[in-house]
Amino acid sequence: MVNYGFLSTYPPTQCGLATFCAALLHHLSNPMAGSRCGVVQVVDGAYQTMRQDEAASVITARPLTASRAAEVLNRYDVLIIQHEYGIYGGLDGEDVLAVLDRVDVPVIAVLHTVLASPTPHQRLVLQRVIDASDAVVVLSQTAAAALKAGYLIDEGRVSVIPHGAPILGHRRPGRASGLHRPTILTWGLIGPGKGIEWAIAALSHLRDLHPAARYLVAGQTHPKVLADQGEAYRDGLRRQARTEGVSDLVEFDPTYRAVGSLMNMVRQADVVLLPYDSTQQVTSGVLIEAVAAQRPVVATGFPHARELLGGGAGLVVPHQDPQAMAHAIRRVLTEPGLAEAMKERCAKLAPALTWPSVANDYRALAKSLLAAPVTVAP
């Protein structure tokens, strides 16, 4: 069996990469079969090891230098590194290169961000990460195209493996009897750039729906936003809702939810709304989870949304356009057969998006690297 080392943020850190790493680790780990996993955790740009119990919950942490981090990771058969510029130290996260330069096991680099227009230094850092890796994983076809167009890499080293999602039961949770009030849901860590202000503005165009729609914004404020700005963004959204006259339609739920509770909430939604401001986002875990949960999606036209929803799993609208957003939501809630057609399309996509399926793809990739002939320098 293969033993996997990870270089990544990791819970209790609250960020998408930490959640991703924990889920992938869980589904790759198989102690009964002799396959173990370990993490060198990235915290505020520094490295530390973690001692874990069988459930992978953190007990203690020990700081590491780059050379010691590499030494720890070299104890595993394969290293899986999560890459995003903001999690590593140095300019554009360049400190990660000092670790990669010292690693002598096969490296799989998972690129969560492939910018369409990087700065010269961002391009240099990512190119060096690519050069230090034996395989590169991107999470969408759009990201693969951007990577091949903007960087020097053999196409055979690039794999597209989607972000994973939990497996859900086939039955949707029951509803209370009576007139159903539709729920529009946005969830995830909250902060500027999520576009929630445009969603609130869209509600004023949906006042005539009966029964009135409820817009549920679920999730805690992003820790970095909270540290820098406090709850200014969330407070501003509340003020906007009052000004727009839709405060009775908007509900904020800052509760931290475990995976089961979160997915139960998602399955109760009539529409998942992703009003993001970004025009370059090539992967979205929330989008993957919504599709895997077979929920109709309305999203702004960021690249991953255009790719995943283009076949009918959702509707894509222009950025920062409340009227277009409202029109799409109205269609999902009122147009006969549309929501069901979206769910059917999501159901066809869902099996390949589950974490067990995704983990199998990583497992196959790791085994192919270990089976490859070793080139010995003359």
What are these regions (language model features)?
Residues 176-194, 200-203, 216-218:
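Conserved donor-binding/catalytic core segment of Leloir-type glycosyltransferases
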Residues 311, 315-322, 331-337:
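Conserved acidic donor-binding segment of nucleotide-sugar-dependent glycosyltransferases
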Residues 272, 292, 296-299:
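Short hydrophobic beta-strand element within catalytic cores of glycosyltransferases
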Residues 120, 148-149, 164-180:
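Acidic anion/phosphate-binding donor-loop and adjacent secondary structure
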Residues 142, 164, 221:
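Carbohydrate-associated surface elements
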Residues 331, 338-352, 364:
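A short, well-ordered alpha-helix in the C-terminal region of glycosyltransferases
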Residues 355-378:
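C-terminal alpha-helical cap of glycosyltransferases
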Residues 229-256:
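Nucleotide-activated donor-binding/catalytic signature segment of Leloir-type glycosyltransferases, i.e.
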